[in-house]
Swiss-Prot record:
<dbReference type="GO" id="GO:0005852">
    <property type="term" value="C:eukaryotic translation initiation factor 3 complex"/>
</dbReference>
<keyword id="KW-0648">Protein biosynthesis</keyword>
<dbReference type="GO" id="GO:0003743">
    <property type="term" value="F:translation initiation factor activity"/>
</dbReference>
<dbReference type="GO" id="GO:0033290">
    <property type="term" value="C:eukaryotic 48S preinitiation complex"/>
</dbReference>
<keyword id="KW-0396">Initiation factor</keyword>
<feature type="domain" description="PCI">
    <location>
        <begin position="306"/>
        <end position="514"/>
    </location>
</feature>
<dbReference type="GO" id="GO:0001732">
    <property type="term" value="P:formation of cytoplasmic translation initiation complex"/>
</dbReference>
<keyword id="KW-0963">Cytoplasm</keyword>
<comment type="subunit">
    <text>Component of the eukaryotic translation initiation factor 3 (eIF-3) complex. The eIF-3 complex interacts with pix.</text>
</comment>
<dbReference type="GO" id="GO:0016282">
    <property type="term" value="C:eukaryotic 43S preinitiation complex"/>
</dbReference>
<dbReference type="InterPro" id="IPR011990">
    <property type="entry name" value="TPR-like_helical_dom_sf"/>
</dbReference>
<comment type="function">
    <text>Component of the eukaryotic translation initiation factor 3 (eIF-3) complex, which is involved in protein synthesis of a specialized repertoire of mRNAs and, together with other initiation factors, stimulates binding of mRNA and methionyl-tRNAi to the 40S ribosome. The eIF-3 complex specifically targets and initiates translation of a subset of mRNAs involved in cell proliferation.</text>
</comment>
<dbReference type="InterPro" id="IPR000717">
    <property type="entry name" value="PCI_dom"/>
</dbReference>
<comment type="similarity">
    <text>Belongs to the eIF-3 subunit L family.</text>
</comment>
<dbReference type="InterPro" id="IPR019382">
    <property type="entry name" value="eIF3l"/>
</dbReference>
<protein>
    <recommendedName>
        <fullName>Eukaryotic translation initiation factor 3 subunit L</fullName>
    </recommendedName>
</protein>
<dbReference type="Pfam" id="PF10255">
    <property type="entry name" value="Paf67"/>
</dbReference>
């Protein structure tokens, strides 16, 4: 194991007088000193990694990033940090760009692996390292000639937003901090990881890449290179711009601003595949936050479509990410959250979904919980929401003189209250729906007596309010076409419709029967394709 104890032992041999005053000799001395302390495979990995990034060798960079780095982390640094900057600098000739990228991985590893999480100083240093990276690529007069794999660019932006979220939660947890720590956080470090910094960086990446103009050009059938500009023509800037749009979606969702969350994605046709959606984790994260935003905006039909489409995608593409265990765990967790959210949406807005998704809901016993929710069990709604929602944050830190308390849960409890208020308005609607489905005509007084055998005239008046609520809640804004996910037309999503003439309810069943033909056609085509592949195999 390569850790702090080994450092302490080796440091006994450090000789201050070995420095000669000659910069070249001193650098050589430091290189040999730090290299002697590192395991050989770590040292050679860092040297080769630096060389691959210098040469822009994408294949080698991706292999070392996706495979070698996690393997060495597991073997040498499972619960400890990687070597610090000065140690690595000595063996990579102080390569500025590589050291910034290395520190991004270094602090990411600390957030993910070190028990107890990063210290305040490490959080602040990570923020300034991100600033160095973004200043390097945004403030340059000409595009920086840097090639990184798309998966690294996505995870870099995603980690940047995650560390903002993590710092906001750390900042809000006052009960675990001394008065000096609170003072230091609120006064000395009030600007680090601030929401304005995060939004500024993400919007700057979007602007410099001209990604919105490029996406609009693609939707109009125009060559995006004509509007990309000097920076946006490079894949490095273009993909950073695209991933920053998804980062903005996540940030606004964490703040509870669902309208703006969907708004920032306007150039992206959410419900269509694109050339930019080749990173599974990015596509899944996008759909999770879009679907959640739709649910909170009471656009249940769009939320159901978003969740169903991405869950089908996950079912069909598991082999793409199953080789990376940490990514597999993350995607499986997000998929589980989306099944919970889909179950909520189907209770509030029943409609037909793909049979394979229904099968998963049955196998995982979601139907029992869905039945309880249909019967008005608010605790099940609450537990499903708490499990599946994002970990919301407040854009502002607690006041310096705030009582010593844990403020982490405040944003989530506020969003939970908003959601539960909506659920309470709808909790009686499934009962009303179940009675209406049994009849084509039904007197108001008879329906009132079904709901309450001792119904009075006042109860009949209240029933009219409930029926009006049913009409209102079942009428949703539904996206049909166009680049804006906010647009749509009002449609009734209920399986039945009705109108009231005098004291008589006239009911029409609008339920669309299952289209089993499509299911069998897909299976036949899949079987034929498999049969062709088997015939082409040479044994």
């Amino acid at each position: 194991m390569y850790g702090g104890d080994e450092y302490a032992t080796n440091s006994d041999y450090y000789d201050d007088y070995a420095h000669t005053g000659d910069p070249q000799l001193d650098m050589e001395y430091e290189r040999n000193y730090y290299a002697a302390r590192m395991p050989d495979n770590v040292k050679y990995f860092l040297i080769n990694f630096c060389q691959a990034i210098k040469e822009g060798n994408l294949y080698d960079i991706q292999n070392m990033y996706e495979n070698t780095f996690p393997q060495i982390s597991d073997h040498h640094f499972d619960k400890t940090a990687w070597p610090e900057e000065q140690e690595v600098a000595a063996i990579v000739d102080n390569d500025k760009v590589f050291l910034i990228l290395y520190k991004e991985l270094y602090y990411r590893h600390i957030h993910a692996r070190i028990p107890g999480g990063p210290k305040l100083e490490q959080r602040i240093n990570s923020f300034f390292n991100y600033c160095d990276f973004f200043n390097l690529i945004i403030s340059a007069q000409n595009p920086v000639m840097l090639e990184l794999p798309d998966i690294w660019l996505w995870e870099l932006v995603d980690e940047f937003v995650y560390q903002f979220q993590n710092f906001a939660q750390y900042r809000a947890r006052l009960t675990e901090k001394s008065q000096d720590e609170i003072q230091q956080l609120c006064v000395n470090h009030s600007n680090e990881w601030s929401i304005l910094c995060i939004l500024n960086v993400l919007h700057s990446l979007v602007d410099i890449s001209n990604i919105k103009k490029q996406l609009e050009a693609i939707s109009q059938g125009v060559d995006p290179q004509t509007v990309a500009g000097d920076f946006g023509k490079l894949s490095f800037y273009k993909m950073l711009g695209y991933f920053s749009l998804v980062g903005l979606l996540r940030v606004h969702s964490l703040l509870g601003d669902y309208y703006q969350a969907i708004k920032v994605l306007e150039p992206i046709e959410i419900h269509k595949k694109s050339a930019y959606s080749h990173i599974p984790a990015c596509q899944i994260s996008t759909s999770y936050y879009v679907g959640f935003a739709y649910m909170m905006m009471r656009r249940y039909a769009d939320a159901i479509r978003t969740f169903s489409d991405i869950l089908l995608y996950i079912q069909r593409t598991k082999q793409l990410y199953s080789t990376r265990s940490y990514q597999n765990d993350q995607i499986n967790k997000q998929a589980e959250q989306m099944y919970h959210l889909l179950a909520i949406c189907l209770v509030l807005h029943p409609q037909c979904i793909d049979e394979s998704i229904q099968q998963v809901l049955r196998e995982k016993n979601y139907h029992d919980a869905m039945f309880k929710m249909q019967c008005g069990d608010l605790e099940v709604f609450k537990s499903f929401f708490v499990f599946a929602c994002p970990r919301f944050v407040s854009p502002c830190p607690p006041a310096v003189d705030a009582p010593m308390d844990d403020y982490v849960k405040d944003p989530m409890e506020h969003q939970l209250q908003v959601f539960m208020d909506e659920v309470r308005q709808q909790k009686d609607l499934p009962t009303t729906r179940s009675y209406l489905k049994l009849y084509t005509t039904l007197p108001l007084t008879k329906l009132a007596s079904f709901i309450d055998p001792n119904a009075s005239e006042d109860d009949v008046s209240k029933l009219l309010i409930r029926l009006l609520c049913f009409k209102h809640k079942m009428r949703n804004l539904v996206w049909s076409k166009g680049p804006s996910g906010l647009e749509g037309t009002f449609k009734s999503g209920s399986e039945l419709d009705f109108y009231i003439d005098d004291d008589m309810i006239h009911i029409a069943d609008t339920k669309v029967s299952h289209r089993y033909g499509d299911f069998f056609v897909r299976k036949i085509l899949k079987f034929n394709d498999l049969n062709r592949k088997l015939k082409n195999i040479n044994i």
